[in-house]
Amino acid sequence: MNDGLYHSMTPTTRLAPGEQVLHAFNPDKGAYWRDHAWIAAVAMAAGMVILWAIGNPHVWTGAVGGLAAVAVRAFYVASDEMQARWDLTDRRLLGPQTRAVHLGEIATIRTLGSAVQVVTRSGDKHLLKYQPDRDATRQRIESAMSGAF
């Protein structure tokens, strides 16, 4: 397999004859850091609660550990996550590498934080992460599904 295609964070699936890209969904740095701030807050609180529950007198170290863990992850994967792109065509939703979902196969579209989850009729789940406006992303996909784009 071509290693460049396998590790690509943009769609590598070829367009069908006559198929047109209607919109490209790119991640947003502000949404990325905002989501990680929320994750860090939860990790800090969880770390403190766990240490308190086991009777550790240094509960504050749970906050430090939670923050450090999320911060390391956030900085480590930021460059990859900011390159991920999804393309919406008049027929399909094309994701990083060779991910492709026919619009007619989409069963459910959900939102969580800044992400939009697309669930197919066969149960496959795809996540468009760190969207600047998750509701607009959802609306664009729904409009393309109904042919009203």
Where are these regions (language model features)?
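Acidic, Ser/Thr-rich low-complexity segments on the non-lumenal side of membrane proteins
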Residues: 96-136
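N-terminal membrane-targeting/pre-transmembrane regions
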Residues: 1-52
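Conserved beta-hairpin
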Residues: 67-108
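Alpha-helical transmembrane spans
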Residues: 30-82
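Soluble periplasmic/extracytoplasmic beta-strand elements of cell-envelope proteins
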Residues: 21-24, 87, 117
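A general structural signal for short secondary-structure boundary/capping elements
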Residues: 55-57, 63-71, 115, 130-143
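A generic structural signal for short, non-catalytic loop/turn and secondary-structure boundary residues
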Residues: 14-18, 81, 121
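A membrane-cytosol interface segment of integral membrane proteins
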Residues: 2, 19-20, 26, 121-149
